[in-house]
Amino acid sequence: MTEFTLNAQARTDLGKGASRRLRHSANIPAVVYGGNQDAQSLTILAKEITKLFENEAAFSHVLELNVDGAKQNVVVKALQRHPAKGFIMHADFVRVVAGQKLTAKVPVHFINEEAPVKKGGEISHVESEIEVSCEAKDLPEFIEVDLANAEIGTIIHLSDLKAPKGVEFVALAHGDDKAVANVHAPRVAPEAEGAAE
């Protein structure tokens, strides 16, 4: 696994006003919790966290969070982004404890997409990430979805995917066999249909 490090400082100035002041000073508020320890409020440099999460792999790797010199292993639980501009406004991290399962969202990588397209199909990506449950050592960088044998009308569900060893799909474990992608016939605009007649 690639190692990702993020520096942070503990903060005691809490609330909406404090968070707003942080953002105006090129920092963002964050919190780390779990691991049988109290939640801790943090301050992180906006440019540092933005650079880290430009790398897709950072979302599905154990990160080393350095809080005022004290290092701890964490995974990102959630990033709150500005609705219009997309920049990170807040981050939630969960501490990783060896031997304990964690849940994380892992990106989906679609391969062999050209195969159904050559057969005249169009692909709809229903899910771009999948929530998994596993120990930190088993956390995959991504889940691969192979579309080589997909035909028009194919719907690929979670149950069609092979989970890596030690990894469980959370939705499937709760009886929700979500669709991940489907292949359908091209949609024809009504004007085009009329012109063809």
From Swiss-Prot:
Look up the record and give one Gene Ontology term from the biological process aspect.
Answer: translation
* GO-annotated cellular components: cytosolic large ribosomal subunit
| Sample GO molecular function, one term | structural constituent of ribosome
Cystine residue pairs? none
The answer on whether this UniProt entry bears the keyword Ribonucleoprotein reads yes
* Assigned keywords, A-Z: Ribonucleoprotein, Ribosomal protein, RNA-binding, rRNA-binding
User: To which protein family does this belong?
Assistant: Belongs to the bacterial ribosomal protein bL25 family. CTC subfamily.
State the function annotated in the UniProt record: This is one of the proteins that binds to the 5S RNA in the ribosome where it forms part of the central protuberance.
Q: How does it assemble?
A: Part of the 50S ribosomal subunit; part of the 5S rRNA/L5/L18/L25 subcomplex. Contacts the 5S rRNA. Binds to the 5S rRNA independently of L5 and L18.
Q: What is this protein called?
A: Large ribosomal subunit protein bL25
